[in-house]
Swiss-Prot record:
Belongs to the Orn/Lys/Arg decarboxylase class-II family. LysA subfamily. Pfam families: Orn_Arg_deC_N, Orn_DAP_Arg_deC. One of its GO terms (cellular component) is chloroplast. NCBIfam families: lysA. The gene is LYSA2. Substrate binds at R348, R384, Y388, E417, Y445. It comes from Arabidopsis thaliana (Mouse-ear cress). Its main location: plastid. The active site is at C416. Its cofactor is pyridoxal 5'-phosphate. This is Diaminopimelate decarboxylase 2, chloroplastic. The modification N-acetylalanine is found at A51. Coiled coil: none annotated.
Length: 489
């Protein structure tokens, strides 16, 4: 893109350039058939561990989790419904290939739960675009007042295309390029400083763009979020953030560059799939200590940015998990006591439970010791089980004949890898060929991590509207799309 390659020579706003890339809104067809150096003493290195937190939150109740009830439900007749619309009917109308199906009303309900929790607190709900980067979903979240958390230059460009207010956007990352930082400076987004070289690049970007950059310092709090190591981002071994014993160096550097940098806050990020909200309070207590010290050195910081996402009930086992209200209540008084603006970065908890990945059964087989349901979807479209050994609930969309044997299956795809599975040892009725099968809670880190391995093309996406009608919100990729990368070579 010309807008990308010419940043350094063209410091003017990129918005006008991006307009030529606006998607044709009419191309997303509507289907009418169904109604993110000082003299002061060095700061003491502090460490907190969630496992020994003394600030336990109130007991969670099933009522507190009501905002996150599942939008996909089985009826007494054995059919799966999304917002009252039968999934089997949708399968019979759309393209005969795997697809992602969302509930637009559930996206709204999830965001409203955060907005309700944040009442009385100056805040920004920064949706983590990495969780799901569908443009139509971004536009919907923006229309509901969401900000955006970005971890790449292209996510920043997409946020601008979706109409997000740049002053409600936060640019994270441990390897931000100079070109992307120039764009961030031009547009006025917040930038979280991750390292010494990152700060130097932000200073250079400010000089190129001619604009002062609002920055927050990403401090690694060394908090144990008790999650999968691949999604833990706030412990001492993480590649992200500033070591707290180095904080004074960064404060001195910001003071040395008053034209380029304005320090407005502090940031930490804990990880993903967090189910113990005391971790957030432990981190907030530590971050407040840092903010108090930063203010004592003359900085007028007004933002506390706590990143890290709530977990969800992937097992569909009735687990009572913390809600946005539970989360915010752990830090509310701390934030208010320091007159801070709170920035949070939900991704998974906003979008995961709004979607399922819909597949067709190609056939059933056995190797003598293990049974397999082979489907047309695969690790190419949904890699979480293969990559993280993650569990996502699987079920059939319609009832099977009474005589269908119920047994344990591995649910696998057609990709030429033994790691190509969506679920292992799942007890299911033996499905007939062509039956519909869904992988639940597929709204986050599924489509955004999809690939074209084995030339499996990325699938289409649809959502169920408030009135029950179905809208295509992303076209399927095709073989012709793949060939375009080689045109003129």
């Amino acid at each position: 893109m010309a807008a990308v390659t010419q940043f350094l020579s063209q410091p003017s706003s990129i918005r006008g350039t991006l307009n030529q890339y606006q998607l044709n809104q009419t191309s997303l067809s509507r289907i009418p058939f169904l109604s993110l150096k000082s003299t002061l003493k060095p700061l003491k290195r502090l460490s907190v561990k969630a496992a020994v937190s003394q600030n336990s939150t109130k007991t969670l109740t099933k009522e507190s989790a009501s905002s996150f009830d599942h939008c996909f439900k089985k009826s007494s007749d054995g059919f799966l419904y999304c917002e009252g619309t039968k999934v089997q009917d949708i399968m019979e109308t759309v393209e005969k290939r795997p697809f992602y199906l969302y509930s637009k009303p559930q996206i709204t309900r999830n965001l409203e739960a955060y907005k309700e929790a944040l009442e009385g607190v100056r805040s920004v709900i920064g949706y983590a675009i990495k969780a799901n980067n569908n443009l139509k979903i971004l536009e919907h979240l923006r229309s509901l007042g969401c900000g955006a958390v970005l971890v790449s230059g292209n996510e920043l460009r997409l946020a601008l295309l979706a109409g997000f207010d740049p002053t409600k956007c936060i640019f994270n990352g441990n390897g931000k390029s100079l070109e992307d930082l120039v764009l961030a400076a031009q547009e006025g987004v917040f930038v979280n400083v991750d390292s010494e070289f990152d700060l130097n690049n932000i200073v250079e970007a400010s000089r190129i763009s001619g604009k002062q950059v609002n920055v927050l310092l990403r401090i690694n709090p060394d908090v144990d979020p008790q999650v999968h190591p691949y999604v833990a981002t706030g412990n001492k071994n993480s590649k992200f953030g500033i070591r707290n014993e180095k904080l004074q160096w960064f404060l001195d550097e910001v003071k040395a560059h008053p034209k380029e940098l304005k320090l407005v806050g502090a940031h930490c990020h804990l990880g993903s799939t967090i189910t113990k909200v005391d971790i957030f309070r432990d981190a907030a207590v530590l971050m407040i200590e840092y903010i108090d010290e930063i203010r004592r050195q003359g900085f007028e910081v007004s933002y506390l940015n706590i990143g890290g996402g709530l977990g969800i009930d992937y097992y569909h086992a009735g687990a009572v998990l913390p809600t946005p209200m539970d989360l915010i209540n752990t830090v509310r008084e701390l934030v208010l006591s320091r007159d801070l603006n709170l920035i949070i970065e939900p991704g998974r908890s906003l979008i995961a439970n709004t979607c399922c990945f819909v597949n067709h059964v190609t056939g059933v087989k056995t190797n003598g010791t293990k049974n397999f349901i082979v489907i047309d979807g695969s690790m190419a479209e949904l890699i979480r089980p293969s990559l993280y050994d993650a569990y996502q609930h699987i079920e059939l969309v319609s009832p099977t004949p009474p005589e269908a044997e119920v047994t344990k299956f591995d649910v696998v795809g057609p990709v030429c890898e033994s790691a190509d599975f969506l679920g292992k040892d799942r007890e299911l009725p033996t499905p007939p060929q062509g039956a519909g099968l869904v992988v639940h809670d597929a709204g986050a880190y599924c489509m955004s991590m999809a690939s074209t391995y084995n030339l499996k093309m990325r699938p289409p996406e649809y959502w169920v509207e408030e009135d029950g009608s179905i809208t295509k919100i992303r076209h399927a990729e095709t073989f012709d799309d793949h060939l375009r990368f080689f045109e003129g070579l």
